Amino acid sequence: MGKYDSKLLGSEEIARATFAFHFEKPAGFQFTPGQSINLFLPEDFPGVSDDRQRAFSLVNAPHEDRLTIATRIRKSAYKQPLKEAAPGTAVQIVGPTGSMSLHDEPDRAIVMIAGGIGITPFMSILRSEAQADRPRPVVLLYSNSRPENAAYLDELRALEQRLNGFRLVLTMTEMKESDRWKGETRRIDADMVKEATSGLPRPHYYVAGAPDMAEDMTAPWGAAGSLAPRWLFQQPARECGLSGRALRTRAAICPFQITEKNGITGSFGVGYWQIVVGVGSAWSGA
């Protein structure tokens, strides 16, 4: 992990109140798809007081010539100044961090489960898979409140047509007073995952979403009893204490507590959205 000087190249709205930010890729910066960075806004950054650091998953694939993050924009002391910053504004990047890389077992399927802006690490992975043209089974279950809030929706639909073996399962769970939607509206649960992954060869599972989604998913995995014991944690927030496996798998920056639920390590947040990653074969019988 290194520290790099960079600058903002530009930004764009990719969904309602959701922006992608593009940064100059520093010389020598290398990362694995699914990893994240810590983005520091310098002391002279316009509009920023003391809130200068956030962790973000990288959206771009390693072969791309710029670094991209995406985030929901709220009126915070960090995000609002970032949204209003002009191209060319200097920033500092520390990273890469995190271990959400794909397993090196091409005979096993990949199941990704994303809630909202949790799609970001999977965009990096899918773009990399498409560039490498690796024909292995990949299923992405992607949940949002409404279509207009779904980041990278059009790109994901295009990837489904382009990437051999990739299947996209979309669900919009709050369709009142929204755009018309004829697709799935259930929350992602064990039954939906079973339906989407039926017949896949010994899949590995990756989950990225908010605390309530993490809690929903850990219970059925624990009940299945066949989840491999490797869980990784990534958290874009402030420092806290971790211990045991969680500390060994990730730098200790988080505002949540690690608990045990049904014998599986789960996470239950207090503020900020979080990413929780589980790797295993919960419904495959492996």
What residue spans do the PLM features occupy?
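Ferredoxin-reductase
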Residues: 2-89, 144-146, 173-174, 286
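Histidine-anchored nucleotide/phosphate-binding helix
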Residues: 119-131
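Conserved beta-strand elements of the Class I
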Residues: 110-113, 206
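Short, conserved phosphate/pyrophosphate- and ester-handling motifs at nucleotide-, phospho-/glycolipid
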Residues: 34, 118, 210
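Conserved S-adenosyl-L-methionine
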Residues: 107, 131-138
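Reductase modules of NAD(P)H-dependent flavoproteins
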Residues: 2-4, 78, 137, 141, ...
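A short, basic/flexible loop-to-alpha-helix module at the beginning of a structural domain
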Residues: 95-106
